[in-house]
């Protein structure tokens, strides 16, 4: 990979949207070829609007209330809102998909380590598996001395040093919804995310996490396979 221009990347405005849906059994019927073609065409067309579809993810069974998640990103939130609304209004899949959860985040430079760039923004390929969740820091966190927070974040980073295959996308979400941060881990194997998350529990920064649910986890999947598997 080419050397990253951290200044350029950190000056980039990039919004992310994670949208989770559920489908009622039987709504799609048995013949789904037209639904697949329409959905695939719709997602491809979003490129013309400046919207990147990073992936579709199968979350069925890992949650009882959801079937799939879409991750999109663009340089303005209106484009993401348009894709979200158009998907629900103009596609057969969208019309029978009930919203479960949707959150938006915006890339901003990391507070202490300007080289900490989200994987998607650094040009990395999407991972085979994803784990997305929001989190909210303790009330005390932002009032702690900079050096104390720097120390805890450094320790947190050191705990993850054995998981270089797990790529992080940690993105601020202040004022964009109910959370302060949205985090998406991508990895080639799901168990690597599980092991990393467990190890990160044993760090001081964990004491300053006030909220970190819901979790949406699953494999990246093609449009064809997703629609074929839906109930």
From Swiss-Prot:
Catalytic function, reaction form: Fe-coproporphyrin III + 2 H2O2 + 2 H(+) = heme b + 2 CO2 + 4 H2O; Fe-coproporphyrin III + H2O2 + H(+) = harderoheme III + CO2 + 2 H2O; harderoheme III + H2O2 + H(+) = heme b + CO2 + 2 H2O
Per UniProt, location of the Isoglutamyl lysine isopeptide (Lys-Gln) (interchain with Q-Cter in protein Pup) cross-link in this chain: 44
Positions that bind Fe-coproporphyrin III: 156
One BP term from GO: heme B biosynthetic process
Pathway: Porphyrin-containing compound metabolism; protoheme biosynthesis
Coiled-coil stretches noted in the UniProt entry, renumbered to this chain: none
EC number assigned by the record: 1.3.98.5
Cofactor comment text: Fe-coproporphyrin III acts both as a substrate and a redox cofactor.
Active site as annotated: 133
Record bears the keyword RNA-binding: no
Pfam families: Chlor_dismutase (PF06778)
Keywords attached to this entry: Heme, Heme biosynthesis, Iron, Isopeptide bond, Metal-binding, Oxidoreductase, Ubl conjugation
Example GO molecular function: metal ion binding
Cofactor: Fe-coproporphyrin III
Gene3D superfamilies: Apc35880, domain 1
Family: Belongs to the ChdC family. Type 2 subfamily.
Function as written in the Swiss-Prot or TrEMBL entry: Involved in coproporphyrin-dependent heme b biosynthesis. Catalyzes the decarboxylation of Fe-coproporphyrin III (coproheme) to heme b (protoheme IX), the last step of the pathway. The reaction occurs in a stepwise manner with a three-propionate intermediate.
Protein name as catalogued: Coproheme decarboxylase
UniProt source species: Mycolicibacterium smegmatis (strain ATCC 700084 / mc(2)155)
